[in-house]
A protein has these predicted regions:
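Phosphate/nucleotide-binding catalytic core
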Residues: 2-275
């Protein structure tokens, strides 16, 4: 029984006004498909344990003026995917990584090409795979680019670039539409959620308090502040339906890796406040 994300494909997303007429159809067929899928698998017992990880990386550019987002995520992902394909043609057993687009145009995601099994040998492969993927990514960057292990870019929304705000997609006064991945899904997702709400996203992260703090929250007005967080996600194929109902990874999760956004400190340092 699988737990995790879906494969991202290219298509024509419907604008919100066009999508509204199809909501009832989508909901009903979604329920029907879920029931059929559930019935096919509800009696499975002792299914093979398979698992994998998804790692999201943020790409940043360094200059004498400081750090900024490097909006080359799609370009870097295409380069890495082409390199994997070339390796696979030359040496079939190589090319062990799949690269995926992510919400931010400064982001790239990697997964192992094939899932790990429950055997010890595969457990030992996890760290080496993560190291190998990061090494491949770094080799695709320019000399002035870095990809550190951080969840959120602290300067996002601080106007440290010349890109126009209030774009037609996010309509944000803090971040430009350029930070959204050019894949059609992400722009449509951003615009449709805003149009469905009738207003911009309203993010309020609790502000760290000290003697000189004014205000209680850090405000943001775009999905990029949450969807732009880089995370490690784990996908499991569970042995049966009962096991798949419970998130067994919860005791292992740690969330205090987002100490600041918009250059001020968050009270609890958790990226969930930005989603």
């Amino acid at each position: 029984m699988g737990k995790g994300g879906a494969v991202l494909t290219v298509g024509r997303p419907l604008p919100w006004q066009e999508a509204k007429d199809k909501l009832a159809y989508v909901r009903q067929h979604g329920v029907d498909q879920f029931i059929q899928h559930y019935r096919r698998h509800e009696t499975k017992q002792r299914d093979t344990l398979l698992y994998g990880d998804e790692i999201e990386y943020g790409l940043f550019k360094l200059s004498s003026d400081g750090a900024s987002l490097s909006l080359r995520g799609d370009e870097v992902r295409s380069l890495l995917s082409n390199r994997e394909a070339e390796e696979r043609r030359a040496i079939p057993e190589s090319g062990k990584v799949t690269w995926h687009p992510e919400y931010g145009s400064w982001m790239v995601e990697s997964t192992p090409e094939k899932p790990y099994s429950g055997y010890t040998d595969d457990l030992r492969r996890v760290e080496s795979s993560m190291r190998s993927r990061r090494a491949r990514l770094l080799m695709a960057l320019k000399d002035d680019e870095v990809a550190p292990t951080v969840v959120a870019f602290p300067l996002l929304g601080m106007s440290n670039d010349d890109l126009p705000r209030n774009g037609p997609v996010a309509s944000s006064v803090l971040v430009p539409d350029d930070v959204i991945n050019p894949h059609p899904r992400f722009g449509a997702l951003t615009k449709n959620i805003r149009e469905r709400r009738g207003s911009n996203v309203n993010v309020e992260a609790p502000l760290f308090q000290d003697d000189n703090t004014t205000g209680d929250t850090i405000k943001a007005d775009a999905m990029a502040f949450g969807m732009g967080c880089c995370c490690l996600q784990v996908t499991f194929q569970c042995r049966d339906v009962d096991e798949s109902r419970h998130d067994l990874g919860v005791p292992l999760c740690r969330g205090a890796f987002t100490p600041s956004t918009r250059l001020v400190s968050i009270r609890r340092g958790r990226g969930w406040f930005l989603f």
